[in-house]
């Protein structure tokens, strides 16, 4: 059984690492899947499979098997993924997106932002819902890294997040990476200062499920800590 966050009509399933499945009235959105147990996909809903970049913890050719099995599927792939990776029979379903691109069909609108690592982040509007999946767009401020590198990172991340100024997402999937040590919260904190989200789903936390609780314990999260979803296991479902 799933957790009802506000009893809404969109179902979110945490799969693994940065992979989530969102199900709305007419669509299913699968983000950055490379492994993990996938819920049964309902027939009659278009499947959108997103891959934010080519890193193996965000992209796998297994998504092409999922697409072939489901049928009505659109593959929304970052332009850094090699086109020749896509099987011939799925080439017509694949769209390669650079940063700062808008793509839409009769169900979904997807906008891309430039990652501070590789590839893109996705801002999606579907069935009256808005979702933001950051991919690896994050404030990667590493302890021990060259100070100039970290300053550039801060500037680049805040510039990109600034493009989202005033936007609102029903669900935001954001990296909360414990490898960053004391700076692990910066990406989410900057995002919430620029934009807004009803629910923040941490991701990219390498199995450390307590990161949400750790973020909530920080003073800086006072204004949004009630909206941080504490994910406790793979396969966990939420209704929002």
Residue map of PLM features:
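A short, acidic, amphipathic alpha-helical segment used as a generic capping/interface helix at domain edges
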Residues: 157-162, 181-190
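Active-site environment of divalent metal-dependent phosphoester hydrolases
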Residues: 36-39, 54-59, 81-85, 118-120, ...
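Binuclear metal-ion centers of metallo-dependent hydrolases, dominated by the metallo-beta-lactamase
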Residues: 13-17, 87-103, 185-240
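Active-site metal-binding motif and surrounding structural segment of the metallo-beta-lactamase
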Residues: 35-84, 162-173
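Structural motif
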Residues: 30-31, 50, 76, 131-134, ...
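Short amphipathic alpha-helical segments
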Residues: 42-44, 61-64, 88-89, 145-146, ...
